[in-house]
Amino acid sequence: VKVFIGISKNRSEYKGTDIMLRAAKHIKEKHPERMELYVVEGVPFNEYVMLMNSSDIIMDQLYSYTPAMNALQAMSQGLICMGGGEEENYEILNEKELRPIINVQPTYESVCKQLEYIVLHPELIPSLKKDGIEYIKKHHDHIKVAKKYEALYNKLLDKS
């Protein structure tokens, strides 16, 4: 299982990257034959994306309830997001079926538990990747989002 974590020096603690990295290193040490860990810091964006896209899982935004832009881009490319994927995220979107995000609580123990589980059950990866792509198409397609904004703006203009 190929796991990717991008480090933003000045925002590591803010994003929870410090905890996620420590947990990832622990699971890599525990299961070296089952997991590859890509830690990327301070590289040009094109290189960052290339390295990210060669992975199975991106670890991002430990303290968030929802995936951020980095995770959404990764999911659109078929990566699995491990990070914020609380039920409130799905409720806001009225999503009843798809659960592509491996949700973790903001603790070292939770990250270790979820990461070890997926490392020991790689057979789950293809369906999570497929669900992630479907989730992006369904809820984050740029045309659909633009049409929702257009409808909102038109509704607001009609009220004035």
Describe the predicted segments one by one:
Residues 49, 71-76, 90-91:
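Short alpha-helical segment that forms part of, or immediately flanks, the ligand-binding pocket
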Residues 53-66, 79:
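Acidic donor-binding loop of glycosyltransferase active sites
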Residues 80-87:
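Short hydrophobic beta-strand element within catalytic cores of glycosyltransferases
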Residues 123-154:
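A charged, aromatic-enriched C-terminal amphipathic alpha-helix characteristic of glycosyltransferases
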